[in-house]
Amino acid sequence: RKFYHPSNSFIYLYGNMDMAEKLDWLDREYLSHYDHQPVDSEIHYQKPFDAPKDREIFYPITEDEPEDHATYLSVNTVVGDDLDPILYMAFQILEYVLLDAPGAILKKELISAGIGQDILGSYENGILQPYFSVIAKNADGSQKEAFLKTVKATLKKLADDGINQKSLLAGINYYEFRSREADFGNAPKGLMYGLQCLDSWLYGGDPLMHLEYEETFAFLKKAAKEGYFEELIRKYLLDNPFEAVITVSPKRGLTAIEDEKLREKLEAYKKSLGAEEIQAIVDGTKELKEYQDTPSPKEDLEKIPLLKRSDIRKEAEKFILTEREIDGTKVLAHELFTSGIGYLRVMFRTDHVPSRDLPYVGLLKAVLGFVDTTKHTYSDLSDEINLNTGGITLSVSSYADSRKQGAFTGIFTASARVLCEK
């Protein structure tokens, strides 16, 4: 009645539709049945720290689990707010350049220093005050000072000497391609757009703020050459007291300690209750259990809308395909609307590979693109790929032969996404 009231909701419609008709239905079937209620849903800004905070948190491990190489080290910095579309995208690009891309400089420096067994980055931008995190996983508590020193020294060097321009432009192109393509995999596009709208809408901003990216990318491409990203590092990651260093350490016996605290708390609460209050809890628990175990009445189940056979389209989708041959190679082309993006797959049969060597085909797939070549380091190769494409991926698959039981055809596939103009 309070939290699930439509006055406390955000409603959006997505798709090609008669908007007036849908809004009329929404009002007639839902909104008109409620009176408007004032709702104070404003999320207030947290006051910045006067100086960085340092905290250690413990997590439980069993008696058999080792304490060595089981600590998580992180430095987390608040970055402006979520209502700046340029900052919102710029730090996604910085996360990619510093920590996510193959050969990313900050990750590389931390790994070279032997800190932790893996380095992670995170830019949490779905909240009013986003934060940027650098995390060393499976580290030791004794590495904390070296971790912080390496992070700050690397960031200072980048701020003073500049970030590799090719890496920056590759990161910008990577996110611009993702924005234009809007490929959310199996997730409905309308749902993902709606969630992205909430990144600003929940905090009083324009719902379309983070969907309108043309001006943002145009600015970032120009600003990348003018020291903009270096200034972001200096302002938000080096000279910013709104920072928390969090150490998460393992502790044996912690589960038993927490269980005992909970037992004592519940025991104290029980002693504060009268006999009638205790009985009310018992009765309420019994009623809840009965409700959960009782099947829903048939008439209620029939209220749930279901697809009818007549709702399913009878016509099969047309398979648009042309087949031709280029230099002795069969080429299959699909002429479809793809928002100006070309999708290319080059497929190689693996019939000629001896069966004993087939596992190495999988190994080849795993390392290609992540090792140095005769012309590029693996970091430079990643930049070249992201500057010129929307990504290149490799896969290995097998297809059963319907004409011969137990036979199959192995395929090694290289897939690329590129703007048609390229």
Question: What name fits each language-model region?
Answer:
Residues 19-37, 161, 239-242, 251-288:
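Extended, regular secondary-structure scaffolds
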Residues 1-29:
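Non-catalytic, conformational "gating/processing" segments within enzyme and secreted inhibitor domains
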Residues 39-103, 133, 188-211, 270-365, ...:
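His/Glu-based metal-binding/catalytic segments typifying zinc-dependent metallopeptidases
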Residues 1, 8-14, 70-80, 107-222, ...:
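M16 family metallopeptidases and their MPP-like homologs
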